[in-house]
Amino acid sequence: VASTESVPVLCIRFLLILMSLLVIGVMIAFGVKPVGMWMHRHRFILGASVIAACVLLNISGSSIGMWNYWLGHDMSTDVVWGTPRIMRTDEYVVGTPLAFSQSYSGYSYFNDLFGNKPADMFIVKDAPVLALAELFRPFHWGYILFGSSRGLAFYWSARLVVLFLAAYEFFLCIS
């Protein structure tokens, strides 16, 4: 590979393009309506498959690659599409480090890695906590089940898929 991009990133790009072309090809071969009806019937399985693929391939929409910029490294390392955004400091300086720090404290309710005294981590939107109340924050389950990196992929992909499916269901109800 002549560019600075890694082979895994190129493989992920290839797979994403291949899947898009496969969907278009199937729609051309079988017709848009039958494929659309099949996708409608299997929308939850397709959504779960998208989440599983993102977790397995470790794909997230995080701008955590900005840390490479601040540390003087190539910012595009391991970026599949787009560029890390400097404006997203709320995510890559605050939210994601708080979520990742929880793995070092065993996902405890209080974490003393930030500040001079233990902080209540359940009150933080992005911090997973190993507690019964975490049942009501399902997007954090990925951190607890899969660890920090794949948990971040689950956090991003599950929120997007659930938002899309909820909007789809809403439009089905009002139409």
Question: What positions do the PLM features span?
Answer:
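Start-transfer (signal-anchor) and selected internal transmembrane alpha helices
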Residues: P8-G65, Y69-L71
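Short, strongly hydrophobic alpha-helical membrane anchors
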Residues: V1-V7
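N-terminal targeting leaders only when they are immediately followed by extended low-complexity/repeat-rich tracts
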Residues: S3, M19-M27, L163-A166, F170, ...
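Active-site lumenal/periplasmic loops and adjacent helix-entry segments of GT-C-fold
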Residues: W67-S175
